[in-house]
Amino acid sequence: MKERKVGLALGGGSARGLAHIGVLKVLEKEGIPINMITGTSVGAVIGALYAQGKDASVIEDLALHLTQKRLFSLMDLTLPRTGFIRGEKIKGLLEMVIGGNAKFSDLRIPFACVATDIMTGEEIVINQGLVLDGVRASISLPGILTLATWGNRHLVDGGLVDPVPVDVLKEMGADFIIAVNVIPDIRARIHITDKDKTGKIKEPNIIGIIMQSIYIATYSLARTSLEGADIAIQPQVAHIGPTNFWEARECIELGEVAAKASIPEIKRKLEA
């Protein structure tokens, strides 16, 4: 296998993003080197953990402990000035697994996460300072989780501008890019998950409306990003609800299935 600078872009997608763990398990097993990582939203969380040197099985164990009861306990609701959920409990959980003092410069694998400046619409690439702060900004779903502050900027989820951060990897020097997208075709998602027993499309609640709006806006962006990757892995997770983190095991398995199917092409292209 030729020496290449292999970059891995892990996209956003809420609970569906747990499929990234399955992809990492397969890449590890097959000996595919990862020289740099970028992540958006849930991809930023998993990417940060992997960049710290935690192997996929350790990250998998963390994900499998996300029970429905545990998740509900993290919902510190607040008056919705910038979001329904204050996010301090979520940040506390992230601090437990990432560490409150871990810096980007401490990471074993170069890593960057992306967020969106809600005032200017700019993509903000975060690759310095505290990893915890960068990840917290990247996961801040607008209207749901309160804004994150980064210097004098107010940041929200990076998926609004770069749901699968392929171009950031190119800027970091990657010359072979594996991108993982878990944002499904919106028509497939509605067909599979949003109908009642009579076949009628359900009316979404306020959180569902916000998330649906984000998915509509980001699906086309994700497809465009994938065009810049050498390999695009797309786990079939449309039937997994975006907040169903307790379905981690199935998400991870679906990530493995998708990654295994891509291994022959990855090896062929790396050896070319």
Which stretches of residues belong to each language-model region?
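Patatin-like phospholipase
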Residues: 1-40, 48-272
